[in-house]
């Protein structure tokens, strides 16, 4: 107890000798707001080679190297840096990746494997189609499968926040073989492995939801 009394006495003495008023004042702490730096929107070009390495470059860089870019890359898309790239696979999935998450740089930069920046797994999946999310919003997509099932889907069906969704329902042992943007005045041509062809207007293709199986096309 005597030791405690001595300590308390010393603390009181120090407080009296060295005490000073607080020099700073915290005001409206409950209203403090942290704002993210706004990204300046600009058009870029998405490039992905046959090995799955993806990157974006500015439009002028692409235009200066257009011939080499077209020869070296499997997928080339003009898009906004604030948008998303949609990756459709044979097993009926759609993966999304933000353009901002894709490496941006020089034309000769290698980029990163698309597997590393999205949920796509090149060891288990195969890409059928890649497009820009914003451009797809105003389009209709035609789906065709190995077993001859087809359907049209409104692009707005794929305006989602999830990184991976089911883009179409498939029957057992079936897979997506073709996806493309279609307009009502186009014609569709289906071909069988036996060499039979069937041609019909795109307007006649049944429009369905993304979660539905298509109808028999051929």
Q: How would you label these PLM feature ranges?
A:
Residues 1-218:
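C-terminal interaction appendages of subunits in large macromolecular complexes
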